[in-house]
């Protein structure tokens, strides 16, 4: 008799990446860098590839310090992750109990659906109109004392739509009043140019995730990070694997 997985895991549907070679396709499905990196970047990276670099465990502390300096934050406010996806999963691991309500817009980044089901959350969705219009009031009215987590990709994928700074602030205040955590996924923020990063110092209910995969074109490196108040980041840190990222990611 086969060993049965947990019932909610058995219900999940996930596709395997079975294509042998995707390089000859226009890979618009994952928004990968199709033009490659400058030769100088590759040459600089090769200088890191020594025997010690490959055989020793990664030292993440220099990258933490560098990010803290660039973002104007303390290292205790930053959590490195395997892409922004890894940071998002850590949020669910640290904060979402079975039965908690998680609010997302729809359609949006696919992994929100996966993690909501994986951690047995009750998924709430605020849907777009046919013209890809989503009034912020539609999101606000779905936030309640039962809401544990609100996930907003800004800009949103796949719609490319954005919430303004004023709208994000309204969502944050409603989340605070309801005791919910507000996650803003800024994976595509470089294409929009506006960030909510400066709100981190104002709220203990806000998290922001970013990735090196999109605008920086480093999808294979699997490097991202989450930022928030030290208490929230400390809880994410408790969920990390032995090493948050690999040595190749630290080189960037």
Features from the language model and the residues they span:
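PLP-dependent aminotransferase class I/II
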Residues: 205-252
């Amino acid at each position: 008799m086969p060993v049965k997985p947990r019932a909610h895991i058995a219900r999940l549907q996930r596709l395997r990446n079975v294509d042998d070679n995707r390089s000859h396709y226009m890979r618009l499905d994952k928004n990968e860098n199709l033009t490659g990196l400058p030769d100088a970047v590759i040459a600089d990276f090769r200088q890191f590839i020594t025997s010690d670099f490959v055989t020793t465990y990664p030292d993440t502390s220099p990258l933490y310090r560098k990010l803290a300096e660039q973002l104007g934050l303390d290292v205790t406010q930053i959590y490195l992750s395997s892409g922004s996806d890894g940071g998002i999963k850590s949020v669910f691991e640290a904060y979402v109990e079975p039965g908690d309500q998680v609010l997302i817009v729809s359609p949006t980044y696919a992994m929100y659906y996966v993690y909501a089901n994986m951690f047995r959350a009750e998924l709430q969705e605020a849907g777009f109109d046919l013209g890809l219009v989503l009034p912020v009031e539609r999101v606000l009215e779905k936030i309640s004392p039962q809401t544990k987590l609100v996930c907003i990709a800004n800009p949103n994928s796949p719609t490319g739509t954005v919430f303004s700074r004023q709208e994000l602030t309204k969502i944050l205040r409603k989340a605070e009043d309801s005791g919910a955590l507000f996650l803003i996924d800024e994976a595509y923020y470089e294409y929009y140019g506006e960030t909510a990063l400066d709100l981190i110092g104002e709220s203990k209910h806000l998290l922001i995730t970013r990735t090196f995969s999109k605008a920086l074109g480093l999808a294979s490196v699997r490097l991202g990070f989450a930022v928030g108040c030290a208490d929230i980041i400390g809880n994410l840190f408790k969920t990390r694997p032995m090493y948050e990222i690999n040595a190749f990611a630290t080189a960037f």
